[in-house]
Amino acid sequence: MTAADWRRTLNPQEQREVRELVGAATEFDAVAPVGEQVLRELGHDRTEHLLIRGSVSGGAADAVVGYLNLTPPRDAQPQMAELVVHPRARRRGIGSALARAALAKTGAANRFWAHGTLEPARATAAALGLSPVRELMQMRRSLRDLPDSVPAVPGVRIRTYAGPADDAELLRVNNAAFAYHPEQGGWTDVELAERRAEPWFDPAGLFLAFGDDDSDRPGRLLGFHWTKVHLDQPGLGEVYVVGVDPCAQGRGLGQALTAVGIEWLARRLGAGDSAADPTVMLYVEADNVAAVRTYQRLGFTTYSVDTAYAVPPAAN
Protein backbone atom coordinates (compact mmCIF):
# COMPACT_ATOMS: atom_id res chain seq x y z
CA MET A 1 0.00 0.00 0.00
CA THR A 2 1.41 3.39 -0.98
CA ALA A 3 1.40 6.44 1.25
CA ALA A 4 -1.55 8.81 0.92
CA ASP A 5 -0.94 11.18 -1.98
CA TRP A 6 -2.75 14.55 -2.02
CA ARG A 7 -3.51 16.06 -5.44
CA ARG A 8 -5.17 19.18 -6.76
CA THR A 9 -5.72 17.50 -10.12
CA LEU A 10 -6.11 13.95 -11.38
CA ASN A 11 -4.97 12.78 -14.78
CA PRO A 12 -7.48 11.00 -17.06
CA GLN A 13 -6.23 7.54 -16.05
CA GLU A 14 -6.62 8.35 -12.35
CA GLN A 15 -10.10 9.73 -12.96
CA ARG A 16 -11.07 6.45 -14.66
CA GLU A 17 -9.61 4.44 -11.79
CA VAL A 18 -11.53 6.44 -9.20
CA ARG A 19 -14.78 6.00 -11.14
CA GLU A 20 -14.14 2.25 -11.37
CA LEU A 21 -13.44 2.18 -7.62
CA VAL A 22 -16.69 4.01 -6.88
CA GLY A 23 -18.56 1.65 -9.20
CA ALA A 24 -17.14 -1.43 -7.48
CA ALA A 25 -18.09 -0.12 -4.04
CA THR A 26 -21.56 0.87 -5.21
CA GLU A 27 -22.20 -2.60 -6.61
CA PHE A 28 -20.90 -4.30 -3.47
CA ASP A 29 -22.64 -2.09 -0.87
CA ALA A 30 -25.81 -1.29 -2.86
CA VAL A 31 -25.23 2.39 -2.04
CA ALA A 32 -22.94 4.94 -3.69
CA PRO A 33 -20.01 5.77 -1.38
CA VAL A 34 -19.73 9.37 -2.58
CA GLY A 35 -22.17 11.97 -3.85
CA GLU A 36 -22.56 13.00 -7.48
CA GLN A 37 -20.67 16.26 -6.86
CA VAL A 38 -17.53 14.30 -6.00
CA LEU A 39 -17.62 12.60 -9.40
CA ARG A 40 -18.23 15.97 -11.02
CA GLU A 41 -15.08 17.33 -9.34
CA LEU A 42 -12.73 14.61 -10.60
CA GLY A 43 -11.84 16.62 -13.69
CA HIS A 44 -11.39 19.93 -11.85
CA ASP A 45 -8.94 21.47 -9.39
CA ARG A 46 -11.59 22.96 -7.09
CA THR A 47 -11.25 20.25 -4.44
CA GLU A 48 -8.38 18.14 -3.14
CA HIS A 49 -7.98 14.48 -4.00
CA LEU A 50 -6.27 11.84 -1.88
CA LEU A 51 -5.25 8.53 -3.45
CA ILE A 52 -3.93 5.31 -1.94
CA ARG A 53 -2.66 2.63 -4.31
CA GLY A 54 -2.28 -1.04 -3.50
CA SER A 55 -3.35 -4.54 -4.44
CA VAL A 56 -6.88 -5.79 -4.91
CA SER A 57 -7.48 -9.34 -3.70
CA GLY A 58 -7.66 -11.55 -6.77
CA GLY A 59 -6.98 -8.57 -9.03
CA ALA A 60 -4.52 -5.83 -9.91
CA ALA A 61 -1.37 -5.36 -7.83
CA ASP A 62 -1.24 -1.60 -8.39
CA ALA A 63 -4.72 -0.10 -8.32
CA VAL A 64 -6.39 2.85 -6.64
CA VAL A 65 -7.78 1.07 -3.57
CA GLY A 66 -8.68 4.17 -1.58
CA TYR A 67 -9.86 7.65 -2.52
CA LEU A 68 -10.91 10.71 -0.51
CA ASN A 69 -12.28 14.01 -1.78
CA LEU A 70 -11.94 17.13 0.39
CA THR A 71 -13.84 20.35 -0.32
CA PRO A 72 -12.26 23.74 0.40
CA PRO A 73 -13.58 25.97 3.22
CA ARG A 74 -16.62 27.97 2.09
CA ASP A 75 -18.59 30.71 3.85
CA ALA A 76 -17.70 29.46 7.33
CA GLN A 77 -18.95 25.99 6.40
CA PRO A 78 -16.70 23.11 7.50
CA GLN A 79 -14.74 21.25 4.86
CA MET A 80 -16.43 18.04 3.79
CA ALA A 81 -14.64 14.77 3.08
CA GLU A 82 -16.08 11.76 1.24
CA LEU A 83 -14.12 8.56 0.87
CA VAL A 84 -14.28 5.08 -0.61
CA VAL A 85 -12.26 1.87 -0.19
CA HIS A 86 -12.33 -0.97 -2.70
CA PRO A 87 -14.45 -3.89 -1.39
CA ARG A 88 -11.55 -6.31 -1.96
CA ALA A 89 -9.04 -4.10 -0.16
CA ARG A 90 -10.94 -3.52 3.06
CA ARG A 91 -9.93 -4.39 6.62
CA ARG A 92 -6.42 -3.14 5.94
CA GLY A 93 -6.78 0.24 7.63
CA ILE A 94 -7.13 2.14 4.34
CA GLY A 95 -10.31 3.95 5.36
CA SER A 96 -8.80 4.99 8.69
CA ALA A 97 -5.62 6.16 6.94
CA LEU A 98 -7.63 8.32 4.54
CA ALA A 99 -9.71 9.78 7.36
CA ARG A 100 -6.68 10.50 9.55
CA ALA A 101 -4.95 12.25 6.66
CA ALA A 102 -7.96 14.52 6.17
CA LEU A 103 -8.16 15.31 9.89
CA ALA A 104 -4.46 16.14 9.94
CA LYS A 105 -4.79 18.42 6.91
CA THR A 106 -7.74 20.39 8.32
CA GLY A 107 -6.73 20.44 11.96
CA ALA A 108 -9.63 18.07 12.72
CA ALA A 109 -12.08 20.71 11.48
CA ASN A 110 -13.64 18.77 8.60
CA ARG A 111 -16.67 16.50 8.43
CA PHE A 112 -17.06 13.10 6.77
CA TRP A 113 -20.09 11.89 4.84
CA ALA A 114 -21.02 8.26 5.43
CA HIS A 115 -23.51 7.46 2.67
CA GLY A 116 -25.99 4.87 3.84
CA THR A 117 -24.39 4.92 7.31
CA LEU A 118 -23.07 1.40 6.80
CA GLU A 119 -21.58 -0.57 9.68
CA PRO A 120 -17.92 -0.22 8.50
CA ALA A 121 -18.35 3.56 8.39
CA ARG A 122 -19.89 3.61 11.86
CA ALA A 123 -17.04 1.47 13.20
CA THR A 124 -14.38 3.70 11.62
CA ALA A 125 -16.06 6.82 12.98
CA ALA A 126 -16.19 5.33 16.47
CA ALA A 127 -12.53 4.29 16.32
CA LEU A 128 -11.55 7.84 15.37
CA GLY A 129 -13.70 9.42 18.07
CA LEU A 130 -16.11 11.02 15.57
CA SER A 131 -19.74 11.80 16.38
CA PRO A 132 -22.82 12.30 14.14
CA VAL A 133 -23.47 15.99 13.45
CA ARG A 134 -25.92 15.85 10.53
CA GLU A 135 -28.31 13.36 9.00
CA LEU A 136 -29.68 13.39 5.46
CA MET A 137 -32.66 11.13 4.86
CA GLN A 138 -33.38 9.46 1.55
CA MET A 139 -37.13 8.95 1.21
CA ARG A 140 -38.94 6.99 -1.51
CA ARG A 141 -42.41 6.14 -2.73
CA SER A 142 -43.94 4.25 -5.62
CA LEU A 143 -45.04 6.27 -8.63
CA ARG A 144 -48.22 4.21 -8.77
CA ASP A 145 -51.47 5.28 -7.11
CA LEU A 146 -50.65 8.98 -6.98
CA PRO A 147 -53.28 11.47 -5.76
CA ASP A 148 -55.86 12.22 -8.44
CA SER A 149 -55.22 15.96 -8.57
CA VAL A 150 -52.43 18.43 -7.88
CA PRO A 151 -53.37 21.02 -5.24
CA ALA A 152 -53.83 24.41 -6.89
CA VAL A 153 -52.27 27.54 -5.38
CA PRO A 154 -54.27 30.71 -6.10
CA GLY A 155 -52.41 33.39 -8.05
CA VAL A 156 -49.68 31.02 -9.21
CA ARG A 157 -48.94 29.60 -12.64
CA ILE A 158 -46.47 26.78 -13.24
CA ARG A 159 -44.49 26.25 -16.43
CA THR A 160 -41.30 24.44 -17.41
CA TYR A 161 -37.81 25.86 -17.83
CA ALA A 162 -37.48 28.02 -20.94
CA GLY A 163 -33.70 28.36 -21.05
CA PRO A 164 -30.97 30.68 -19.74
CA ALA A 165 -33.39 33.61 -19.60
CA ASP A 166 -34.82 31.95 -16.48
CA ASP A 167 -31.44 31.55 -14.80
CA ALA A 168 -31.24 34.84 -12.88
CA GLU A 169 -34.56 34.25 -11.12
CA LEU A 170 -33.78 30.58 -10.60
CA LEU A 171 -30.51 31.46 -8.88
CA ARG A 172 -32.16 34.18 -6.80
CA VAL A 173 -34.81 31.84 -5.43
CA ASN A 174 -32.39 28.94 -4.97
CA ASN A 175 -29.94 31.02 -2.97
CA ALA A 176 -32.68 32.62 -0.89
CA ALA A 177 -34.32 29.28 -0.14
CA PHE A 178 -31.02 27.57 0.69
CA ALA A 179 -29.04 30.41 2.24
CA TYR A 180 -28.23 28.10 5.16
CA HIS A 181 -27.37 25.02 3.10
CA PRO A 182 -23.71 23.99 2.65
CA GLU A 183 -24.21 22.26 -0.72
CA GLN A 184 -27.27 23.86 -2.31
CA GLY A 185 -26.72 27.47 -1.25
CA GLY A 186 -24.51 30.06 -2.91
CA TRP A 187 -25.00 28.78 -6.45
CA THR A 188 -23.72 30.73 -9.45
CA ASP A 189 -24.05 30.35 -13.21
CA VAL A 190 -21.30 27.71 -12.97
CA GLU A 191 -23.39 25.32 -10.89
CA LEU A 192 -26.39 25.74 -13.19
CA ALA A 193 -24.31 25.22 -16.32
CA GLU A 194 -22.73 22.05 -14.93
CA ARG A 195 -26.12 20.53 -14.18
CA ARG A 196 -27.54 21.53 -17.57
CA ALA A 197 -24.60 19.66 -19.10
CA GLU A 198 -25.46 16.44 -17.27
CA PRO A 199 -26.90 13.70 -19.52
CA TRP A 200 -29.97 13.42 -17.28
CA PHE A 201 -30.94 17.10 -17.60
CA ASP A 202 -34.34 17.62 -19.22
CA PRO A 203 -35.88 21.13 -19.32
CA ALA A 204 -39.31 19.50 -19.42
CA GLY A 205 -38.64 18.23 -15.90
CA LEU A 206 -37.73 21.60 -14.35
CA PHE A 207 -40.90 23.31 -13.12
CA LEU A 208 -41.09 27.02 -12.28
CA ALA A 209 -43.89 28.67 -10.30
CA PHE A 210 -44.57 32.34 -11.00
CA GLY A 211 -46.78 34.73 -9.08
CA ASP A 212 -49.49 36.60 -10.96
CA ASP A 213 -50.91 38.44 -7.95
CA ASP A 214 -47.96 40.67 -6.97
CA SER A 215 -48.62 44.23 -8.10
CA ASP A 216 -45.04 45.32 -7.39
CA ARG A 217 -43.31 42.47 -9.16
CA PRO A 218 -45.77 40.66 -11.44
CA GLY A 219 -44.57 37.38 -12.80
CA ARG A 220 -41.71 36.94 -10.32
CA LEU A 221 -40.47 33.43 -9.61
CA LEU A 222 -41.80 32.05 -6.33
CA GLY A 223 -40.44 28.52 -6.41
CA PHE A 224 -39.19 25.66 -8.52
CA HIS A 225 -38.98 21.87 -8.65
CA TRP A 226 -36.09 20.27 -10.47
CA THR A 227 -36.62 16.58 -11.22
CA LYS A 228 -34.08 13.99 -12.28
CA VAL A 229 -34.36 10.64 -14.04
CA HIS A 230 -31.57 8.23 -13.07
CA LEU A 231 -30.38 6.93 -16.43
CA ASP A 232 -28.22 4.25 -14.77
CA GLN A 233 -31.11 2.95 -12.65
CA PRO A 234 -34.14 2.27 -14.86
CA GLY A 235 -37.43 3.21 -13.26
CA LEU A 236 -35.94 5.59 -10.69
CA GLY A 237 -36.77 9.29 -10.64
CA GLU A 238 -35.81 11.95 -8.14
CA VAL A 239 -37.20 15.09 -6.57
CA TYR A 240 -33.79 16.68 -7.17
CA VAL A 241 -34.39 20.13 -5.68
CA VAL A 242 -37.52 21.91 -4.47
CA GLY A 243 -36.95 25.55 -3.58
CA VAL A 244 -39.46 28.18 -2.46
CA ASP A 245 -38.73 31.87 -1.98
CA PRO A 246 -38.94 32.56 1.77
CA CYS A 247 -41.38 35.38 0.95
CA ALA A 248 -43.76 32.83 -0.62
CA GLN A 249 -43.66 30.15 2.06
CA GLY A 250 -46.76 29.07 3.93
CA ARG A 251 -48.98 28.90 0.84
CA GLY A 252 -48.60 25.21 0.03
CA LEU A 253 -46.38 26.00 -2.95
CA GLY A 254 -43.71 23.43 -2.08
CA GLN A 255 -46.26 20.63 -1.90
CA ALA A 256 -47.90 21.74 -5.16
CA LEU A 257 -44.57 21.90 -7.01
CA THR A 258 -43.54 18.53 -5.64
CA ALA A 259 -46.80 16.96 -6.77
CA VAL A 260 -46.50 18.44 -10.28
CA GLY A 261 -43.00 17.04 -10.67
CA ILE A 262 -43.95 13.63 -9.32
CA GLU A 263 -46.84 13.39 -11.79
CA TRP A 264 -44.43 14.21 -14.62
CA LEU A 265 -41.97 11.55 -13.41
CA ALA A 266 -44.79 9.00 -13.28
CA ARG A 267 -45.66 9.69 -16.92
CA ARG A 268 -41.99 9.80 -17.95
CA LEU A 269 -41.20 6.48 -16.27
CA GLY A 270 -44.31 4.67 -17.46
CA ALA A 271 -46.24 4.23 -14.23
CA GLY A 272 -49.29 3.41 -16.33
CA ASP A 273 -47.55 0.32 -17.72
CA SER A 274 -48.61 -2.71 -15.71
CA ALA A 275 -45.12 -4.19 -16.12
CA ALA A 276 -43.36 -1.11 -14.77
CA ASP A 277 -42.69 -0.43 -11.11
CA PRO A 278 -41.21 3.08 -11.09
CA THR A 279 -40.10 4.79 -7.90
CA VAL A 280 -39.32 8.37 -6.91
CA MET A 281 -36.72 9.33 -4.33
CA LEU A 282 -35.59 12.51 -2.61
CA TYR A 283 -33.16 13.75 0.01
CA VAL A 284 -34.18 15.87 2.99
CA GLU A 285 -32.42 17.03 6.13
CA ALA A 286 -33.59 14.86 9.02
CA ASP A 287 -34.06 17.91 11.26
CA ASN A 288 -36.25 19.72 8.70
CA VAL A 289 -39.43 18.54 10.38
CA ALA A 290 -41.79 20.58 8.19
CA ALA A 291 -40.33 19.20 4.96
CA VAL A 292 -40.29 15.63 6.26
CA ARG A 293 -43.96 15.90 7.20
CA THR A 294 -44.82 17.34 3.78
CA TYR A 295 -43.17 14.39 2.06
CA GLN A 296 -44.81 11.92 4.42
CA ARG A 297 -48.19 13.39 3.47
CA LEU A 298 -47.25 12.73 -0.15
CA GLY A 299 -46.64 9.06 0.66
CA PHE A 300 -42.85 9.01 1.11
CA THR A 301 -41.16 6.78 3.69
CA THR A 302 -37.55 6.63 4.85
CA TYR A 303 -35.33 4.43 2.65
CA SER A 304 -31.84 5.17 4.04
CA VAL A 305 -29.91 7.78 6.02
CA ASP A 306 -26.57 9.46 5.22
CA THR A 307 -24.66 10.68 8.27
CA ALA A 308 -22.03 13.40 8.58
CA TYR A 309 -19.45 12.73 11.28
CA ALA A 310 -17.03 15.15 12.93
CA VAL A 311 -14.74 15.49 15.91
CA PRO A 312 -16.90 16.67 18.86
CA PRO A 313 -16.36 20.41 19.57
CA ALA A 314 -14.96 19.74 23.04
CA ALA A 315 -12.29 17.49 21.55
CA ASN A 316 -11.44 19.72 18.61
Curated annotation (Swiss-Prot):
Acetyl-CoA 1 binds at L83, V84, V85, R91, R92, G93, I94, G95, S96. 1D-myo-inositol 2-(L-cysteinylamino)-2-deoxy-alpha-D-glucopyranoside binds at E36, E183, K228, E238, Y283. Its EC number is 2.3.1.189. It catalyses: 1D-myo-inositol 2-(L-cysteinylamino)-2-deoxy-alpha-D-glucopyranoside + acetyl-CoA = mycothiol + CoA + H(+). Residues 16-153, 156-316 form the N-acetyltransferase domain. Belongs to the acetyltransferase family. MshD subfamily. This is Mycothiol acetyltransferase. It comes from Mycolicibacterium paratuberculosis (strain ATCC BAA-968 / K-10).
